[in-house]
Each structure stands twice: as structure tokens, then as C-alpha cells.
Regions:
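PLP-dependent enzyme catalytic core of the Aspartate aminotransferase-like
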Residues: 439-472
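Well-ordered mid-protein domain cores that form the structural environment of catalytic cofactors
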Residues: 88-171, 177-179, 185-186
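Glycine- and acidic
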Residues: 3, 44, 100-108, 130-137, ...
Length: 472
């Protein structure tokens, strides 16, 4: 493809993306892809093309094969999982990132990549109201960030002996403590870090689905009394099921007393902390050792962009650094080499989409969208609370409303089947998308508000769809 051909194709694709977003906003597509497993695979050639193809053929397949197999996360009626927004400014930042072909092996391989990431992560720190004691780096996802945090916790608890001799070299097993509502990625991170399920403690939650600090204290003390070593506590700030907020201040106090690392998983809720009125929800976060939040969810940078912050970057670098001779530079003592801040050696220029987004939206623009979604969630909460045959099963802390339709006098198992059916009927209709989930043994329906284009009319629409599906 020549530069001129690229220019023509690029203009065409920018128009295509802009048109797609307009069509999504007009609700031209069913929110959930209407396809069956294997349908796209069967429609595509089983072998790669041997000769170059015209760009028009690629465009045709994009329209006729790829797009029909997409679930439309940008649709204003998408209320499943959590938001995965990619604002236009971030899309353009991603385009420039790929177009520049930068590779962040070390500072020298791309000074712009390294230093823009430093600046953007410090901007986010300020937007979150965090102190200057925090230093940040972009990871691909919160799963990776949590894994890095638990490896750092393991090395601090073992005085770096685990790196030399492995966990089997430890006389006392190292224990990790998580909420029973913690994301599955926390368990996976602990397993990959070598802890094993026998060395994980699932701490019970209260009526609001937040970790019970007293139960954590009891578990820490019991393990210590039996010769085990508390290593890490993972507090959840905005759980996946209900956006429950663990009491970070009390958890931090317990972790500090036990000598355990405290990692805060704020993958979703962290975005909300750019509005000051949300910050009481993570009171005590300054006492944590590390925290993560995902701008690629609610804020709109697009995947993959996970902001990981630590209070002791020297410890992080000691744990993660290998520093072979071929990666050293003449400026080694003057610069940050982000390869030593995580797993990846080769790093994409992710900060560009952050930079584009913050410039194009401004802090006030991003805050306004968060506040809009919070207001929509409170509106839906009020509707559910006023309906005699519906109940909320969790507090509405942020933008997620968890509901359940009631069938008085019916067997609980039948009510579970009924609520699962409601979610399935809404999703199959194409008029909205919600997530069925199980909370403490009961089937419920999650309505997660936060797509960029979602306005009050779309929240009213999903509420009407839920009521209609309940009557079906």
C-alpha cells in the first residue's frame, strides 16, 4: 500500500467508523450480535489469500461478515458487564500510536513514549485526588496489574527470597486475603504468582456485599497464630457484581498491623473518583501499597489501558527488573524504563490515547459524563424502589443497578429461573443488553450504565424492557 493508497483508505475508514457510531447512536443494530457459534468462522476462507486483494474487498467483508458478528458495546442501550468506551479522540490517539510504530523497550527506544506516559499518569493521579507519593505506569489490563501487585507482595513478605528459591523455600506459607466478591482475575493472579488456592482466604461480605473488616482481622490473626504468614490483602473498590465498596480504611489498618501488602482493585470505580463527591467511597486509599483502575472502562480510552499506581516504585523495579546488557542505555540513572515496571518488555504507545482524550475532553468534560451516568443510575434506582413487584439487591454506589423481579409465594428456584428468563428475553429482543448474575445464591439482573451515548431515554427504555419481559 503506497502512501497515497493509505491516505484514501484511511479517509474511507475514518468515515466508516464515524458512520458506524452514528448508526449505533440511532439504534440501527440489535445490541447483541445475532449470530451462532462458528458462523463467522464458517463464512471466512479456510486458507489465507495468496495474492493481494483490493481494499474494497476488505471493506465488503467488514460490512457483510465482521460487523454482523459484533455485539455493540458503544450502543447507548448497552448495559451489560461494565462500559468499554472508546471516545473518538482516543480512537485517533490509537491510530497515531500504530502509525508511528513506536516500541517502548527502554527510554532510548522511544523517549516520547516513556515521558508522555509519565506525564499522563501524573495527570490521572491529580484527577483522582491522590497524593504525590504515588507513581504510575500503564498496564494492559487490571488482571496484569493485580498479578504484578501480588508478585511485589510476595517478594516483600519473603524479603526477596521467593525470587531466588521459589515459594517452596519459605518456612511459613504466604497467605492472600480477598473479598468473596473479588473479581476472578484476583484468584488467577494469586495462582500465577504461586500462592495456590490453599493459601487464599475468601473473606465474607456484609449486607452491602463489602468485605467485613472484622472477619478479615479474625482471619489474619488465626493464620498468624497457626504459623502462617499474611502476605497480601486485595480490597475491592467497585465489585463486578454490584460495585460494592470494601471499607479500605479499616482494611488498611488490619493489613498494616499484620505486615501484609494492601492492593486496591478499583478497576471500575477508580474512574468515578475524578469527581470529588465519589472519593469518600475509597476513603483510606492513601494507606494502600498499590492500586489499579481502568480508564478503558468508564472514561473511554479504549482497550487496553489500565493505570497501575505504587507508593514504592523502587521495590517494584527491584522485583521486575532483569536489565540485560543489550537494553541498557547511557541514561540509565536519569530515566524511567517502564519495562521494569511490569511484565512486558515491548510496550505500545498507549499514553497517546490518554493524551488525546484528556486534551479533547478536559477534566470538566470527563467529570460531566461521570455525573450524568450517576444521575441516570439514581433515576433507575428510584423507579425500582417505587415498583411493588421489583426489588434492588444491592446499594447503588455508582452506575450499576442490581434488580430482581418478585413472584410472591413462588418457589425460590422458580423465581431464579424467571429472572434469568427476563434477562435473556431482553437481550434476545435486541432493544437492550443486560447481564444476568448470581448474588449470594440468588439470580439477579445487572443494569450497568455508562456507554458514552447513553442518555435518560435509554435508561427509561431498558426499564420498560425489563418490565415487559417480566410480564411475558
Amino acid at each position: 500500500m503506497t502512501p497515497e493508497e493509505f491516505r484514501r483508505a484511511g479517509h474511507e475508514l475514518i468515515d466508516w467508523v464515524a458512520d458506524y457510531r452514528e448508526r449505533v447512536a440511532r439504534a440501527e443494530f440489535p445490541v447483541m450480535a445475532r449470530t451462532t457459534p462458528g458462523a463467522l468462522r464458517a463464512a471466512l476462507p479456510s486458507a489465507p489469500p495468496q495474492s493481494p486483494e483490493e481494499f474494497a474487498a476488505i471493506r465488503r467483508d467488514l460490512d457483510e461478515l465482521i460487523l454482523p458478528a459484533c455485539t455493540h458495546w458503544l450502543d447507548p442501550r448497552f448495559h451489560g458487564y461494565f462500559p468499554s468506551n472508546g471516545l473518538p479522540a482516543a480512537v485517533l490517539g490509537d491510530l497515531v500510536s500504530t502509525g508511528l510504530g513506536q516500541l517502548g523497550l527502554n527510554w532510548q527506544s522511544s523517549p516520547a513514549l516513556t515521558e508522555l506516559e509519565e506525564v499522563c499518569l501524573d495527570w490521572w493521579r491529580q484527577m483522582l485526588g491522590l497524593s504525590e507519593r504515588w507513581s504510575g505506569v500503564i498496564q494492559d489490563t487490571a488482571s496484569t496489574a493485580t498479578f504484578v501487585a501480588l508478585v511485589c507482595a510476595r517478594e516483600r513478605a519473603s524479603n526477596h527470597a521467593a525470587t531466588r528459591g521459589g515459594l517452596q523455600s519459605q518456612a511459613s506459607p504466604l497467605i492472600v486475603y480477598v473479598s468473596s466478591q473479588a473479581h476472578s482475575s484476583v484468584e488467577k493472579a494469586a495462582l500465577l504468582a504461586g500462592f495456590g488456592r490453599a493459601c487464599m482466604r475468601s473473606i465474607e461480605t456484609d449486607a452491602d456485599h463489602a468485605m467485613k473488616a472484622d472477619a478479615l482481622v479474625a482471619a489474619l490473626e488465626d493464620d498468624a497464630a497457626h504459623g502462617l504468614k499474611p502476605c497480601a490483602v486485595v480490597a475491592t473498590c467497585g465489585s463486578t457484581a454490584t460495585t460494592a465498596m470494601d471499607p479500605i480504611a479499616r482494611i488498611a489498618e488490619a493489613a498494616k498491623k499484620a505486615g501484609a501488602w494492601l492492593h486496591v482493585d478499583a478497576a471500575m470505580a477508580g474512574s468515578g473518583m475524578i469527581v470529588p463527591e465519589c472519593r469518600p467511597l475509597w476513603q483510606g486509599v492513601e494507606a494502600a501499597d498499590s492500586l489499579v483502575f481502568n480508564p478503558h472502562k468508564w472514561l473511554g480510552t479504549g482497550m487496553e489501558c489500565s493505570a497501575y499506581y505504587v507508593r514504592d516504585p523502587q521495590h517494584l523495579v527491584r522485583v521486575m527488573s532483569t536489565n540485560p546488557s543489550y537494553l541498557r542505555t547511557a541514561h540509565e540513572g536519569e530515566v524511567k524504563n517502564f519495562r521494569d515496571w511490569g511484565i512486558q518488555l515491548g510496550r505500545r504507545f498507549r499514553a497517546l490515547k490518554l493524551w488525546f482524550l484528556i486534551h479533547e475532553q478536559g477534566v470538566r468534560g470527563l467529570q460531566a459524563r461521570i455525573r450524568r451516568d450517576l444521575e441516570h443510575a439514581q433515576w433507575l434506582k428510584a423507579q425500582v424502589d417505587a415498583a411493588k413487584d421489583w426489588e434492588r439487591v444491592a446499594p447503588v454506589q455508582l452506575q450499576t443497578v442490581c434488580v430482581r423481579h418478585l413472584l410472591p409465594g413462588r418457589d425460590p428456584a422458580a423465581v431464579d429461573v424467571h429472572n434469568l428468563g427476563i434477562a435473556q428475553r431482553v437481550n434476545a429482543s435486541g432493544v437492550a443488553y443486560v447481564t444476568p448474575a448470581v448474588l449470594k445464591g440468588q439470580q439477579m439482573i445487572r443494569v450497568s450504565i455508562g456507554a458514552v451515548a447513553t442518555e435518560r431515554q435509554h435508561v427509561e427504555q431498558v426499564w420498560a424492557a425489563l418490565q415487559q419481559a417480566a410480564r411475558a
